[in-house]
Amino acid sequence: MIQRDFFGRWPLAWIGFALLVLGIPAIGFAHERGADLGAILPAVNATLNATSGVLLYLGWRAIRARRIEVHWRLMVSATVVSACFLVVYLTRVALTGVHRYPVEGWSKSVYLAVLSTHTLLAATVPFLVAVTLWRAAHERFDRHRRIARWTLPIWLYVSVTGVLVYLMLYHLAPALA
């Protein structure tokens, strides 16, 4: 088994790791000082989701070009950014609770359809990613490719719909109200 350097000289993974380690105490500090985390954290989460989606796409492009080391680093970076998202999301829910879509009508139906598929698939992503990365790290590339064909589109869908849910809940709904 090749010992892979998860962070190496790849700065994005280090940035994600720093966000995870330093960001959570900063959120707690801001909350203690009365900052409106309900307004800040959803935008942070949408940014993390978008970043993860871009990294996933670039990682897919890298492997299609047979740039294996670049692919590995991009996918590990996407994993770190997604882990940051999960921690910030759970922190936001713990601090501010869940948010309901404030408008009735067709937009709520679309929102709930997107949200339900996003939520169901998001629950599978950590497990799919863990298995996919484990197989790559242990050089079981035939099995890695088989599960990656499922992991990538699901993970990309969850990243994109995460941004869409944010836009619908925090920007579209208030505009329609």
Predicted feature residues:
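Alpha-helical membrane insertion/targeting regions
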Residues: 1-177
